Amino acid sequence: MITLENVNKIYSNNLHAVKDVNLKVNEGDIFGIIGLSGAGKSSLIRLINRLEEPTSGKIFINGENILNLNKTELLERRKKIGMIFQHFNLLSSRTVEENVAFALEIANWNKKDIGKRVSELLEIVGLSDKAKYYPSQLSGGQKQRVSIARALANNPDILLSDEATSALDPKTTKSILELIKEIQQKFSLTVLMITHQMEVVKEICNKVAIMSDGRIVEQGGVHHIFAEPKNEITKELISYVHQQTDTELNYLHHKGKKIIKVKFLGTSTQEPIISKVIKEYGIDISVFGGTIDKLATMNIGHLYLELDGDLAAQTKAIEFMQTMDVIVEVIYNGD
């Protein structure tokens, strides 16, 4: 659906915002691109519909290199790419229905069809009763719903989201993500989401790429990235989700007792593994606590354990667990 090959963006001030990016987004993906501020995320997404022009590289949508399109061809292709923004980009002098209609007007829809289409779109986003309101009369979440309705106006195949929830409170963020997921399924959209919020990735994405200093440093299925992050930036972003639990463990170090985090993907269960380890290696295991990451693709369970007994036996027990269908991370080595 969307393929980027060796894409670079260098601005006139010599800022190299996007560096040799290679990315593939398949049809039907809800693909998240996450990174800290200044990582190059927003620059990257604006290249996909050529709001910004890349300095070099190739960008394919449905097998067509959009960099070869002339202005007329590009405008036609853009009708199939909807986009929503952090600050909504609504026209303050237009009502809700007029803001949505604007997207149809510039796409040269027949005037007699615009009213019906606007009504359909407002019903989809739950704002039929706000059609005559102005943006100043709406909450942040309602404004973003108008933005989503406008983005859907021309029946797009692709929806681009540039930090669409970062200005919203957690409750409103959840409702907007639920709406995006609903319309993605209903209209078979491919969604590309820029965010700095790992919670957004957890809630809705099936795949994710992590950006740092203009480069994609890691990418893959969300559950794989959460379970076994490789890059230090990825580990840092994920650590924010588990910050409280991991911080509490720093106060529980006891000499001679290793502390481990055991991660269980999907339906794998922990009890048989733990009981087998206790019997096989003659050690005691205390459970400090656990968390569950409820991802869009599957759940990942995190169990925090303290091992007690002969250190060599503890080490062998960990090595045994690493051969099972779990991921083991040593948090404290008992030294």
From Swiss-Prot:
InterPro entries: AAA+_ATPase, ABC_transporter-like_ATP-bd, ABC_transporter-like_CS, ACT-like_dom_sf, MetN_ABC, MetN_ABC_transporter-like, NIL_domain, P-loop_NTPase. It is found in: Cell inner membrane. ATP binds at G35, L36, S37, G38, A39, G40, K41, S42. The keyword Repeat does not apply. GO terms for molecular function: ABC-type D-methionine transporter activity; ATP binding; ATP hydrolysis activity. SUPFAM superfamilies: ACT-like, P-loop containing nucleoside triphosphate hydrolases. Its EC number is 7.4.2.11. The keyword Translocase applies. Keywords: Amino-acid transport, ATP-binding, Cell inner membrane, Cell membrane, Membrane, Nucleotide-binding, Translocase, Transport. It is a peripheral membrane protein. Residues 2-238 form the ABC transporter domain. Disulfide bonds: none annotated. GO terms for cellular component: plasma membrane. Its main location: membrane. The complex is composed of two ATP-binding proteins (MetN), two transmembrane proteins (MetI) and a solute-binding protein (MetQ). PANTHER family: AMINO ACID IMPORT ATP-BINDING PROTEIN, METHIONINE IMPORT ATP-BINDING PROTEIN METN. Belongs to the ABC transporter superfamily. Methionine importer (TC 3.A.1.24) family. Part of the ABC transporter complex MetNIQ involved in methionine import. Responsible for energy coupling to the transport system. This is Methionine import ATP-binding protein MetN. It comes from Fusobacterium nucleatum subsp. nucleatum (strain ATCC 25586 / DSM 15643 / BCRC 10681 / CIP 101130 / JCM 8532 / KCTC 2640 / LMG 13131 / VPI 4355). The lineage of its organism: Bacteria, Fusobacteriati, Fusobacteriota, Fusobacteriia, Fusobacteriales. The gene is metN.
